[in-house]
Amino acid sequence: MTRRIQVGAVPVGGGAAVSIQSMCNTPTEDVNATVRQIQRLEQAGCEIVRVAVPTEEAARAIPSIKAAIHIPLVADVHFDYRLALLCVDGGVDKIRINPGNIGSKDRVRAVADACRERNIPIRVGVNGGSLEKDLVQKYGGVTAEALAESALGHVRLLEECGFGDICISVKCSRVPVNMAAYELLHEKVDYPLHLGVTEAGTPEMGVLKSAIGIGGLLCRGIGDTLRVSLTADPVEEVVAAKRILQACGLRQTGPDLIACPTCGRTKYDMLPIAREVERRLKSCDKPITVAVMGCVVNGPGEASAADVGIAGGKGEGLLFAKGTVLRKVPEDQLVDALFEEIDKL
C-alpha cells in the first residue's frame, strides 16, 4: 500500500478512494472565469482541481480563487520557484513542480521548507515531452525507464531536503510506455501515484487511451488519484474519469447501463431504445445496474445481475428484475415501463 498524503480535505493514497482531478483551461488571473469553471467541475464530481501558474499575476489570484471554491486547489508551477512560494502563501492545497527545473538546490529547499511548514504536498510531475535530454540519449528515446528515472531523480532532490509529502506522476502519450513507467514506480517507491495519459487527444480517442492506460493500472491495484487529459471542456474529463472508475468497479456514482451487442435473434430496433434509456439515465443518481437486451430468449438470463432491465421481441418485450420476468410490455411502452420500475428502486 502507498503512503497517504492529504490534499486539503481529500486523502490520497494509503487505501483512500481513488480521487478525480481535472485542470482549468482558463487564464488563472481571470478569477471570475476560473471560479465559474471550477464550480462547474465541482458539480460534475471533480474532487481536486489544478490551475496553471505561469506568472506572478496568476499566483496572486490563488487566494481569491481558493476563497470561492469548495475543493482542493493545486498550483502548477514551472521554472520560477518564487511563484511556488507565492502560491503557498496564498493558501494553495498542493504544488505541482519538477524540482529539477526550478533552479539550484537552495531554491528547491525553499519550496520544500515552505510546503512542509504548511503541510502542503508536492507532486513531482514528469511528462514525456519535457524529459531531460540526457535521459532521452541514455535510453534512446522516451521510454518507461527514462520516465521513471527522471521522476525518481526529482523525488531524490526533495528527499535530500528532508521532504517526503510527495505524489508522483509519469505521463506519456503512448499508452504502453505510460503504463510500464507507472509499474516501475509502483515497484520502487511507496509514494502515491497520480495516473494519467498526457496529450490523449479529443474525447473520441482520448477517452479510449485513458480507459486503457488508467483503467488497466487501476485494475492491477496501481494508482491513487487520476486525471483524464482531454482536448475538450474539462467537465468531460470528470465524466470520463467517473466512468473509468465505475468500469473498474472502484466507484458507482450512478446507474450502470449494460446492453447486448445484438445478433440475428434481435427482433426489434434496439439501438434507439438503448440510446433513449442512456439519455434518461443521465438524470438518475441511483447506484443501480440497468439492462437493455436484444431478445426475450436469452436477455433476462444473461442480464440476471441487473437490478432492472428490458428485453425486446417482435412488437413487445419483457420487463425483468434480477433475472425474473415481471411482465410483458408493448414495444412502444418499454422505456416508460422500465423507468417506472426504476422509480420504485
Q: Residue ranges of each PLM-predicted region?
A:
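Hydrophobic or amphipathic alpha-helical targeting/insertion segments
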Residues: 82-123
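Alpha-helix-loop-beta-strand connector modules within alpha/beta enzyme cores
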Residues: 55-77, 110-122, 182-193, 277-281
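N-terminal amphipathic alpha-helix/helix-capping segment at the start of soluble metabolic enzymes
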Residues: 1-22, 116, 279
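Catalytic alpha/beta core domains of metabolic enzymes, predominantly
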Residues: 127-130, 135-282
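Active-site mouth loops of central-metabolism enzymes
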Residues: 15-33, 52, 71-79, 135-148, ...
